[in-house]
Amino acid sequence: LGDVYKRQLYLWLEYRASIYLWIAGIIMPAVYIFVYYDAGLYADFGINIYYLGAAIYGWMMWKYGAFLRRTILRRKGAGQKGEDTRTEEQKLELPITHMPARYLLPLTAVFIAALLGIAWILINFTDSNVPWLDSFTTALSIAGMWMLARKYVEQWWAWIAVDAVSAGLYIYKGLDFTAGLYALYTIIAIFGYFKWRKMMNKDEGLEIRD
C-alpha cells in the first residue's frame, strides 16, 4: 500500500503542476535503484536510473526553465515586447506549453527505438508472455517523462495511454486490484490534461500584456 500512496501523492502533485512532484520523483527512484540492484533486477535498476536523471532534469527545468529560455531569446534578439505582469517567481519557473512540432519526429524515433529494444530484451532474455505490451508502456513512459520534464501539456496523452494499456494488461494478468488502480489513474490523467490546459491558458494571459 505504501507504493499506492506514493503514486497517488505523485499524481496529485502532477495534477496541480506542483514542482514538488520532482522531490518525490527524485526520492523514489533513488531508493529503488539500490533495491533493484540488490535483487538482481537489472532492467528495473536501469529504468530507475533514467527516472532519477529525468526527475533532476525536470526539477531544474521547472524551477529555472523560463529564465533560461528568456536569456536565450535575448541573445538571439527575439525577446518579447510589452509589459510582463508575472511575479518574479513566475518569471523564473517554466510555464505549461504545447510541445513544439519539431520535437514530434525525434521523440517518436526515440519511442520506437526504445519499444523495439525493450521488446527484444524481453523476448530473448525473459519469460514474459506480453513482451510487446510491456515494452509499449515502458517506452511510452520514457517519452512521457521527458515531456513532463519540459512541462508540455501533451505529456498527459502519454500517461492516459500508458495507464489505460496497463489497466488492460493487469486484467489479463489477473491482478484486478492493480488494474482498478490504473483505471483510476487513467481517469485522473484525463482530468489532468484539461486542468493543465486551463492553467496554460491562464499563464498565457498573464505572461505579456501589450
Where are the regions a protein language model picked out?
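Short, small-residue-biased leader/transition segments that mark boundaries at the very start
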Residues: 1-5, 163
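Short, basic, low-complexity termini and linkers enriched in Ser/Thr/Gly/Pro
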Residues: 4-5, 68-92, 96-97, 101, ...
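Hydrophobic core of alpha-helical transmembrane segments in multi-pass integral membrane proteins
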Residues: 6-9, 102-121, 186-189
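Membrane-helix interface "capping/anchor" motifs
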Residues: 12-23, 146-158
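Loop-to-transmembrane alpha-helix initiation sites
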Residues: 44-48, 174-185
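Membrane-water interface of transmembrane alpha-helices
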Residues: 50-72
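Alpha-helical transmembrane segments in multipass membrane proteins, preferentially the mid-helix core
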Residues: 116-128, 135-153
